[in-house]
């Protein structure tokens, strides 16, 4: 097998600037630099790491250094799986899954079909039975071996995705990571309801929030305060406290405000229940809805009134004058 070896030449001045573990006064006297072999090896390896210190032969001195730029580094990709349908993961997200040496997913919250694209030999694990430290332990083990890791979260990982503590750990340990966003369940709800969640001149804001359950809410973000704007409200993780949610929202929204309770959005067993705000708790209770349920409130649900000015004949913009 032929090897391609690149020759590099350095001046004594360049070599003298490199700190080496075994400087020589004799070499300094004759060559004008305290080291030739070790200094040259380190210079060629971008001053990374000395792998083999200088060895003396009868007519030569040799040393070897490792350029860490050529060593495979570990990496963690936090990927948003989307709301459920495997086809809704992004192109980049699927590419990351196909590349991964380890896929750590969120168990039953992520469809198994999504990990079928894993390459041969990849490890696929569920984090459902792991606490945070156990998750860190398995990811660090693969990372330290230079492996590519996908941490697969439901929806978009940056929305109620519990990635804050993970990023904190990665930052503290100097670990490389990146986030691939995913489609959130509130976007899937808009599509399933065939509704634009903003209405020209009526509703121009979308509130993403949750009811106050085991996780306390900041006082300024109580549901009844958020409801004062009567914006389109998408309420995560709150089906189990639907009665409390209804009570708070009725302080500001009319009782006839449209609501939609969306279960398992984009999954094969998806169910959508529509009604009015005064019926919210009853809808949830009668259909035994708890987990993976999104509650949407607002007059934008099913609305067909109000026209955007964007495509009006007299509306001028950069591409139409």
Walk through the language-model features, giving the residues of each:
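Class I S-adenosyl-L-methionine
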Residues: 2, 6-42, 69-86, 91-183, ...
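A contiguous loop/helix-start segment that scaffolds small-molecule binding in enzyme catalytic cores
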Residues: 12-15, 20-31, 54, 60-61, ...
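Metal-ion/cofactor- or nucleotide/acyl-coenzyme-handling active-site neighborhoods
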Residues: 7, 63-66, 71-72, 127, ...
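C-terminal edge-of-domain segments
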Residues: 38-69, 293-299
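Short, solvent-exposed amphipathic alpha-helical segments in soluble enzyme
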Residues: 66-69, 91-96, 118-121, 166-169, ...
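Acidic/glycine-enriched edge-of-secondary-structure segments
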Residues: 121-131, 202-210, 233-234
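Short glycine-rich anion-binding loops that position phosphate/pyrophosphate groups of nucleotides
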Residues: 55-59, 67-68, 83-86, 109, ...
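Class I SAM-dependent methyltransferase SAM-binding "motif I" and its flanking Rossmann-like core
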Residues: 85, 156-229, 271-274
């Amino acid at each position: 097998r032929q090897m391609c070896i690149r020759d590099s030449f350095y001046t004594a001045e360049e070599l003298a600037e490199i700190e080496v573990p075994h400087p020589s006064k004799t070499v300094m006297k004759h060559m004008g630099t305290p080291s030739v072999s070790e200094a040259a090896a380190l210079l060629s390896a971008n001053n990374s790491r000395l792998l083999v210190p200088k060895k003396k032969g009868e007519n030569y001195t040799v040393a070897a250094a490792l350029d860490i730029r050529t060593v495979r580094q570990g990496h963690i990709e936090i990927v948003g799986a989307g709301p459920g349908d495997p086809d809704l993961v992004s192109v980049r997200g699927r590419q990351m899954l196909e590349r991964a040496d380890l896929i750590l997913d969120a168990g039953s919250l992520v469809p198994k079909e999504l990990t079928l694209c894993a390459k041969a030999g990849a490890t696929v694990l569920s984090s459902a039975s792991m606490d945070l430290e156990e998750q860190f332990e398995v990811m660090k083990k693969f990372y330290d071996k230079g492996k590519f890791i996908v941490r697969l979260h439901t929806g978009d990982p940056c929305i109620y995705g519990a990635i804050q503590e993970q990023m904190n750990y990665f930052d503290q340990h100097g670990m490389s990571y990146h986030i691939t966003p995913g489609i959130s369940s509130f976007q899937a709800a808009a599509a399933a309801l065939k509704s634009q969640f903003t209405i020209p001149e009526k509703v121009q804001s979308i509130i993403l929030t949750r009811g106050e359950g085991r996780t306390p809410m900041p006082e300024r973000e109580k549901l009844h305060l958020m409801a004062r704007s009567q914006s389109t409200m998408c309420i995560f993780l709150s089906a189990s406290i639907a009665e409390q949610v209804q009570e708070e929202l009725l302080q500001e929204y009319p009782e006839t405000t449209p609501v939609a309770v969306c279960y398992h959005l984009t999954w094969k067993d998806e169910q959508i229940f529509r009604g009015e705000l005064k019926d919210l708790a009853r809808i949830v209770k009668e259909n035994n809805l708890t987990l993976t349920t999104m509650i949407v409130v607002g007059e934008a649900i099913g609305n067909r009134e109000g026209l955007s000015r964007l495509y009006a004949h007299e509306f001028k913009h950069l591409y139409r004058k």
